[in-house]
């Protein structure tokens, strides 16, 4: 849903590094939504209870211990021949400030109108890419090598560089199961 909302902005502002600093109220809303979702998902990824009062310091320490290479992982946008590293530079010394998109989210959250220029295409793209990357890593942690990663819907925007997918979209998985059941019935006849 967040990816779809971001993609709808591309009807008006082309996804291009030349437009990285283009800001809008829609990007402010998206940055707030993605940031809130990312905050919640960090808790899930780290195994913290939803009611725990955790922050970026807690998330950063856990994630970098669990997946230190996250800072080098590239997110690709093949359709636009673009790539970026949303967690590049993330560190435990300044966890919130070392992620520009997170710092932007916090500043928009606390003073939207004074910081509207931070609500730009680049920060929204990086926040969305960071969420996608963390979700994919979480899926790979909970699925064994014999199980597919099964998100509700495959990303139409992102891919991960040097990532091994065990990916079957839900619709194809059910078709596969139906096909196997039909095949078994056919084999018995």
Q: Which residues does each PLM region occupy?
A:
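Charge-enriched, short contiguous segments at helix-coil
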Residues: 109-139
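Charged alpha-helical initiation segments
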Residues: 1-31
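Active-site-adjacent bridging/hinge elements
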Residues: 5-15, 98-109
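Secondary-structure edge/capping motif, primarily at the C-terminal ends of alpha-helices
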Residues: 9-20, 48, 112, 138, ...
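Amphipathic alpha-helices that form helix-helix packing interfaces
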Residues: 2-9, 30, 37, 41-44, ...
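Polyanionic, low-complexity intrinsically disordered segments
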Residues: 139-189
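Short non-catalytic regulatory patches outside canonical folded cores
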Residues: 38-103, 110-114
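Short, solvent-exposed segments of well-ordered alpha helices
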Residues: 21-32, 92-99, 118, 122
